[in-house]
């Protein structure tokens, strides 16, 4: 650890404590993520180490770069590039108003990062505004990519804060264990709606049951025809047959018609029907968008 000088604690992440630090040789500012390991554990699971070392190969401008992995018997510290703030803090500072072009730019960058990782068979599985980081140039970067695979999908933060269910798709809420890239696309849809509403979450459920009710009240409870595999999921239980909201106009009033169409394609209850990151980037919503 002598290579890095800790400057300040930034916060408690899902997996441990995060510090702002400086590389003593290059003076580069980095984020140190100290991963907490269970006391009764034999140190770092080799599977976790393998996964994490793969993440060093994910090099893309919309992915937070993992510079280094420091590993001692009981400690694992991940050294990431430093970003000024996350999307949640950004929402707090924009006072309920977000320029439609910024919404489009952030979603485009989110999809670019997702498409890159998905093409390499890496899923995020725990996307939310807190792990979308934004730097001073308005560049959005996905953080904590692949950590859910290395350490397991978090059920609660180690700081006892409950991990949010707000961005989890219905198939996962019904106990699906086989994930595909579609898990991240649902989360991207929830984040898109939150961007369009300048930080108001789309489905702020209190627990799994409340979460599913909120989703079905908006999108309609899926029938067996619409989603044949639903009733086979481990935690499936029937819900009232809520009708779908006819239009998303009232849900995301500031989003134009093509934006609403893209949102509907992301928020499909049946994971098979969800649009992919590559398909989403080709959607007409982006036809007039010039990437910086």
From Swiss-Prot:
Activity regulation annotation text: Inhibited by 2-(1-ethyl-2-hydroxyethylamino)-6-benzylamino-9-isopropylpurine (roscovitine), 1-isopropyl-4-aminobenzyl-6-ether-linked benzimidazoles, resveratrol, AT-7519 and olomoucine. Activated by CDK5R1 (p35) and CDK5R2 (p39) during the development of the nervous system; degradation of CDK5R1 (p35) and CDK5R2 (p39) by proteasome result in down regulation of kinase activity, during this process, CDK5 phosphorylates p35 and induces its ubiquitination and subsequent degradation.
Modified residues (Phosphoserine): 72, 159
SUPFAM superfamilies, per the entry: Protein kinase-like (PK-like) (SSF56112)
Pfam hit, one: Pkinase
GO terms assigned for molecular function: acetylcholine receptor activator activity; ATP binding; cyclin-dependent protein serine/threonine kinase activity; ErbB-2 class receptor binding; ErbB-3 class receptor binding; Hsp90 protein binding; kinase activity; p53 binding
Keywords: Acetylation, Apoptosis, ATP-binding, Biological rhythms, Cell cycle, Cell division, Cell membrane, Cell projection, Cytoplasm, Kinase, Membrane, Neurodegeneration, Neurogenesis, Nucleotide-binding, Nucleus, Phosphoprotein, Serine/threonine-protein kinase, Synapse, Transferase
E.C. number: 2.7.11.1
Sites bearing Phosphothreonine, chain numbering: 17
Tissue: Specifically expressed in postmitotic neurons and postsynaptic muscle.
Domain of life: Eukaryota
InterPro entries, per the entry: CDK, Kinase-like_dom_sf, Prot_kinase_dom, Protein_kinase_ATP_BS, Ser/Thr_kinase_AS
Processing and modification events after translation: Phosphorylation on Tyr-15 by ABL1 and FYN, and on Ser-159 by casein kinase 1 promotes kinase activity. By contrast, phosphorylation at Thr-14 inhibits activity. Phosphorylation at Ser-159 is essential for maximal catalytic activity.
Full protein name: Cyclin-dependent kinase 5
Organism of derivation: Mus musculus (Mouse)
Gene that this polypeptide is encoded by: Cdk5
């Amino acid at each position: 650890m002598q290579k890095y000088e800790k400057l300040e604690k930034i916060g408690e992440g899902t997996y441990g404590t995060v510090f702002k630090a400086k590389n003593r040789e290059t003076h580069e500012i980095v984020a140190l993520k100290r991963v907490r390991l269970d006391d009764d554990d034999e140190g770092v699971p080799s599977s976790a180490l393998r996964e994490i070392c793969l993440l060093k190969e994910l090099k893309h401008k919309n992915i937070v770069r993992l510079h280094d992995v420091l590993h001692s018997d009981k400690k694992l510290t991940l050294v990431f590039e430093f970003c000024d703030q996350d999307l949640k803090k950004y929402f707090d500072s924009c006072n309920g108003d977000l320029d439609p072009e910024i919404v489009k730019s952030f979603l485009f960058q989110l999809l670019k990062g997702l498409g890159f990782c998905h093409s390499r068979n890496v899923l995020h599985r725990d996307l939310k505004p807190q792990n979308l980081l934004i730097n001073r140039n308005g560049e959005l970067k996905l953080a904590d990519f692949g950590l859910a695979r290395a350490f397991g999908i978090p059920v609660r933060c180690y700081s006892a804060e409950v991990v949010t269910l707000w961005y989890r798709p219905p198939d996962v809420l019904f106990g699906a264990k086989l994930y595909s890239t579609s898990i991240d696309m649902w989360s991207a849809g929830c984040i898109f709606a939150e961007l369009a509403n300048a930080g108001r979450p789309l489905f702020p459920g209190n627990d799994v049951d409340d979460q599913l009710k909120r989703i079905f009240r908006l999108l309609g409870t899926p029938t067996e025809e619409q989603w044949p595999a639903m009733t086979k999921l481990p935690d499936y239980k029937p819900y009232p047959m809520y009708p779908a909201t006819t239009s998303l106009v009232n849900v995301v009033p500031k989003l134009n018609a093509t934006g609403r169409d893209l949102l509907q394609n992301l928020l499909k209850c049946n994971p098979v029907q969800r649009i992919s990151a590559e398909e989403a980037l080709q959607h007409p919503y982006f036809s007039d968008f010039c990437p910086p």
